[in-house]
């Protein structure tokens, strides 16, 4: 049942053990996914859209998972559960209202821009071409970085596997004591190299957000002369566009992280298999090491093949979103609606504000640390 999955996810978000892992984005995603699922499933909405039930299940799971972990986690439970359930209730009530507001906003914008429809369409088209020119090198760079760092990971791990093979040949009679440190180190090197891989690739998405801001700002300036009386409404639509585009950047970052973690999961069992074979004969261990090398090649190649095209896919999604804006602002927009993206943006803004307020309150309540006592100066040497 989707409700239980959401509740469990929300509980786990708050009890991952490290405070840095509890983020506004995680909480907002859980609430938004819950709202979206119920909106798409009328039967489940009728059966389970009960605020009291949601609160009870959240509290029960928080209590079950948290126990007496720490004061921070307990405070988070007390504040987060009511806040999350209130947000969900507000989403349900605000959806239709916001839908009507966005419809009227677009009607006014279209009416104001209609005398300049060709110029507006041309300006947005120019912006699309500039966006494509900007993003093209980033897609190529992502592909290059994926290839470079994936190959670095493969070489690094293959080199360590080859060292283990050399030690095996030299210490056939004393395998366990000779190779155990290498096997343990190999597992650690998998984790280390995967984290380094993510560290090199995930900043790509943050750089794209900067380019998105630049592109949307240029679009705003180019359209401003045609929207002098409705500038605020145009700005609102462009804020929605930027939100959607940046959401794609976050999804790209998540895909990079997920693929890297999946690569780690695929490599770890083979490394563990080598370690377990230390108790067996040299032939069995040699076969495991040979399999390890071929397994490394296959898995790294699959990682590279899966992740390489993501940059191009991301670029196409952004271009499509700008094209959709052109259609919405044009005279033949029809019944295009996008109020849900504004609803989600408002949700995430509220969750961010909630966490900022919570952090400020926590800092105010925290006692000041006493200054360290200075050591008395020693006697002067005569």
UniProtKB/Swiss-Prot annotation:
Subcellular localization: Secreted
The Sequence repeat ranges on this chain: 33-54, 60-81, 82-103, 115-136, 137-158, 159-180, 181-202, 203-224, 225-246, 247-268, 269-286, 287-308, 309-330
GO terms (BP aspect): acylglycerol homeostasis; cholesterol efflux; cholesterol metabolic process; lipoprotein metabolic process; phospholipid efflux
GO molecular function: cholesterol transfer activity; phosphatidylcholine-sterol O-acyltransferase activator activity; phospholipid binding
Signal sequence segment: 1-20
Region (Disordered): 362-382
Keywords attached to this entry: Chylomicron, HDL, Lipid transport, Repeat, Secreted, Signal, Transport
GO cellular component assignments: chylomicron; extracellular vesicle; high-density lipoprotein particle; low-density lipoprotein particle; very-low-density lipoprotein particle
Location of region: 13 X 22 AA approximate tandem repeats: 33-330
Domain of life: Eukaryota
Assembly mode: Homodimer.
Function: May have a role in chylomicrons and VLDL secretion and catabolism. Required for efficient activation of lipoprotein lipase by ApoC-II; potent activator of LCAT. Apoa-IV is a major component of HDL and chylomicrons.
Domain notes: Nine of the thirteen 22-amino acid tandem repeats (each 22-mer is actually a tandem array of two, A and B, related 11-mers) occurring in this sequence are predicted to be highly alpha-helical, and many of these helices are amphipathic. They may therefore serve as lipid-binding domains with lecithin:cholesterol acyltransferase (LCAT) activating abilities.
Family, as annotated: Belongs to the apolipoprotein A1/A4/E family.
Name of the protein this chain belongs to: Apolipoprotein A-IV
Organism: Felis catus (Cat)
């Amino acid at each position: 049942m989707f409700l239980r999955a959401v509740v469990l996810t929300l509980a786990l978000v708050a009890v991952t053990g490290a405070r840095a892992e509890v983020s506004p984005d995680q909480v907002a995603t859980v609430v938004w996914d819950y709202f979206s699922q119920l909106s798409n499933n009328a039967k489940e909405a009728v059966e389970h859209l009960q605020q009291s039930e949601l609160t009870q299940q959240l509290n029960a799971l928080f209590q079950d998972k948290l126990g007496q972990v720490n004061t921070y986690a307990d405070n988070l439970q007390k504040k987060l559960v009511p806040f999350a359930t209130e947000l969900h209730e507000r989403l349900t009530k605000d959806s239709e209202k916001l839908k009507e507001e966005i419809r009227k906003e677009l009607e006014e914008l279209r009416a104001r821009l209609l005398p300049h429809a060709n110029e507006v369409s041309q300006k947005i088209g120019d912006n699309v071409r500039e966006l494509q020119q900007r993003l093209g090198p980033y897609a190529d760079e992502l592909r290059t970085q994926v290839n470079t760092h994936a190959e670095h990971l493969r070489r690094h791990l293959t080199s360590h596997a080859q060292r283990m093979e050399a030690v095996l040949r030299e210490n056939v009679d004393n395998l366990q004591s000779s190779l155990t440190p290498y096997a343990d180190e190999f597992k650690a090197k998998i984790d280390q190299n995967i984290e380094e891989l993510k560290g090199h690739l995930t900043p790509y998405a943050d750089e794209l957000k900067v380019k998105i801001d630049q592109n949307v700002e240029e679009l705003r300036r180019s359209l401003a002369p045609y929207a002098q009386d409705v500038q605020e409404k145009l700005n609102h639509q462009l804020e929605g566009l930027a939100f959607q585009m940046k959401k794609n950047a976050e999804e790209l970052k998540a895909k990079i992280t997920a693929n890297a973690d999946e690569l780690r999961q695929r490599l770890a069992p083979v490394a563990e298999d080598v370690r377990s074979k230390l108790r067996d004969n040299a032939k069995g261990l040699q076969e495991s090491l040979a399999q390890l090398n071929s397994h490394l090649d296959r898995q790294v190649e699959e990682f590279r093949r899966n992740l390489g095209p993501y940059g191009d896919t991301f670029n196409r999604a952004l271009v499509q979103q700008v094209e959709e804006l052109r259609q919405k602002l044009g005279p033949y927009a029809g019944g295009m609606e996008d109020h849900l993206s504004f609803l989600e943006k408002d949700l995430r803004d509220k969750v961010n504000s909630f966490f900022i307020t919570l952090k400020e309150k926590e800092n105010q309540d925290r006692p000041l640390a006493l200054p360290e006592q200075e050591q008395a100066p020693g006697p002067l040497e005569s």
